[in-house]
Amino acid sequence: MERYESLFAQLKERKEGAFVPFVTLGDPGIEQSLKIIDTLIEAGADALELGIPFSDPLADGPTIQNATLRAFAAGVTPAQCFEMLALIRQKHPTIPIGLLMYANLVFNKGIDEFYAQCEKVGVDSVLVADVPIEESAPFRQAALRHNVAPIFICPPNADDDLLRQIASYGRGYTYLLSRAGVTGAENRAALPLNHLVAKLKEYNAAPPLQGFGISTPDQVKAAIDAGAAGAISGSAIVKIIEQHINEPEKMLAALKVFVQPMKVATRS
């Protein structure tokens, strides 16, 4: 958890936001996946958001579902994902590492055992995508027992009660959901991002990182201009992996070319 605090403090001093890429562990295979993660960090990633392949990924669009299928095709198991996490942590002692996953994977291990394992390999945060905040007590309590930050999603239409709960229960960072790709009526109830950010700040929530549909440096800049502490980009990165699936070296080069300007956009 402290890794997030020290990251945000350092970034504030440098007048920068955080750029955080998301990839699925083990996509397209363990060895290349580790190279991908090294490349993302070398290109300027401030923290990592990593998925563990799961057979029924509800919140994921087709791009990330395909990443999961590629990892499964390579025979990647949750146990191997934890071995990978330990290796990443050994190599990169200071970078915050977050997991984005589903409750079933936590239940399979037993909630307490899962978070104990996270602590052991050096994971800083866990976001369980399919557990609403009102059902989160056993997860967040186990997380805190094991020095892992419980992360909560703040949707664009969050009401005051939800904002207060997120501020009170969340640690590390707050996952601020952008309104990417949502049109028409659903859009109307959504508050402007800077209003949400101001409220979260008022309630002393963990710093907000904006995610969902972030694929250009301009979007990163806009998130930070609205008051977010940074931006998370997933599908755009996973798409690059997909496009260069048979050219591992080209893939790494393309990832670097994508990440560098995204990081530059965080500097005010």
UniProtKB/Swiss-Prot annotation:
Key words, A-Z: Amino-acid biosynthesis, Aromatic amino acid biosynthesis, Lyase, Tryptophan biosynthesis
Give the family, as the similarity comment puts it. Belongs to the TrpA family.
Give a Gene Ontology cellular component term annotated to this protein.
cytosol
Say which enzyme class the record assigns.
lyase
What is known about what this protein does? The alpha subunit is responsible for the aldol cleavage of indoleglycerol phosphate to indole and glyceraldehyde 3-phosphate.
Q: What is this protein called?
A: Tryptophan synthase alpha chain
Q: What is its EC number?
A: 4.2.1.20
Q: Pfam families per the record?
A: Trp_syntA (PF00290)
Q: How does it assemble?
A: Tetramer of two alpha and two beta chains.
The protein's matches in PANTHER family, at most eight in alphabetical order, are given as:
TRYPTOPHAN SYNTHASE ALPHA CHAIN, CHLOROPLASTIC, TRYPTOPHAN SYNTHASE, ALPHA CHAIN
Pathway, according to UniProt? Amino-acid biosynthesis; L-tryptophan biosynthesis; L-tryptophan from chorismate: step 5/5
Q: Where is the active site?
A: 49, 60
Upper lineage ranks?
A: Bacteria, Pseudomonadati, Pseudomonadota, Gammaproteobacteria, Enterobacterales
State the reactions this protein catalyses: (1S,2R)-1-C-(indol-3-yl)glycerol 3-phosphate + L-serine = D-glyceraldehyde 3-phosphate + L-tryptophan + H2O
